[in-house]
Amino acid sequence: MAEQGSIRVSRKDDNVVVIEKDLATEEMLLSMGPQHPSTHGVLKLECMTDGEVVTSAEPYLGYLHRCFEKHCEVVDYPGIVPYTDRMDYLAGMNNEWAYCIAVEKLLDIEIPRRVEFIRVMVSELNRIASHLVAIGTYGIDLGAFTPFLFCFRDREHILNLLEWASGARMLYNYIWIGGVAFDIPADFNKRVKEFVDYFRPKVVELYKLLTENEIFVKRTKGIGIMPADVAINYAWSGPMLRGSGVQWDLRRNDPYSVYPELDFNIPVPDGKFSDIGDCLSRHLVRALEMEESLNIIEQCISKMPGSDGFNPRSAVPKRVRPKAGEVYARAENPRGELGFYIQSDGKSTKPLRCKARSSCFVNLSAMKDLSKGQLIPDLVAIIGSIDIVLGEVDR
């Protein structure tokens, strides 16, 4: 009887799986998705595997493509705002704001100070709501169900506040070119302050639920490491880039609106609890950012001008027809930099060209590097740490 070969699997210091074998094997093609619970939408991954080890993972996109940029060429400037809600549908306020910043830059109009504080406040509320979804669903991906329930319990408070201000729970159409649709209700700031006081201890609770879970830590620590220089070369942004130790945040490094007047920190991992650039680091950044958003919201409440004689649409143009030119504007969204390039011919009330720069698309492009040398179950942890929304990836 012929002697059987053997395979030995081990991990290097950087947690990449190493296979030592003295028998012939061949790679196998494994498809994940486009209908798979771990891909957070209609994402397909074509993985080449050597046993349980992934040698390559190629994302296939387009299953949710809706021609957003082409629609922008046949819709007038204000009419595009509701379409932006449907890109990253978990952060509609942030999408609207990024688009409006670009058009306002093209029009060269000044925004009322109260409007600026309202925009910051509702966008930071939306940032927290988005991170709660990211943290809750990440727990489910790795087998922890309870944090999901806690996250959605607290997210409900935020959705109620945003519904009170805008009339909608997810697709808001609240931030308009030059202003906002409505002034916030009389007791809105009071209710927001009550939420801030309620949620501060909950942030600590949610943090401990996962970071003190030994299984969660072992599934994420040292997995999917992305060095800072490679992350920069991929043009990563948001929690993904900060998770690699790069302290880059547009609210601080390229500030817009009233962010220069606000005091807040940019959380980055210190390497004591996680390996810088791994899945756990990216999770920690999102958890810590919620605390900073609460600080920003409190400052907005205290610094916001009064509503006497205030018209939320005072700077909203009756007809938007920018002069001929082009502009690029960007904003710090929950998943990274969302940018809009807009080109105007100076004659039409519709953009000649509107290009959206999606952070989710850029972050997902590194999937091949993130997955190489990892085990198949680790792919679930890596995808969840990217926190993609396919509505923004495909547009």
Swiss-Prot record:
> What is one GO cellular-component annotation here?
plasma membrane
Listed InterPro entries: NADH_Q_OxRdtase_suD, NDH1_su_D/H, NiFe-Hase_large
Enzymatic reactions = a quinone + NADH + 5 H(+)(in) = a quinol + NAD(+) + 4 H(+)(out)
- UniProt keywords, alphabetically: Cell inner membrane, Cell membrane, Membrane, NAD, Quinone, Translocase, Transport
Q: What is its main location?
A: membrane
What Gene3D superfamilies does its record include? Answer: Cytochrome-c3 Hydrogenase, chain B (1.10.645.10)
Listed EC numbers: 7.1.1.-
Q: Which domain of life is it from?
A: Bacteria
Q: Where in the cell is it found?
A: Cell inner membrane
Identify its protein family.
Belongs to the complex I 49 kDa subunit family.
Protein name, entry field: NADH-quinone oxidoreductase subunit D
Q: Which organism is it from?
A: Chlorobium limicola (strain DSM 245 / NBRC 103803 / 6330)
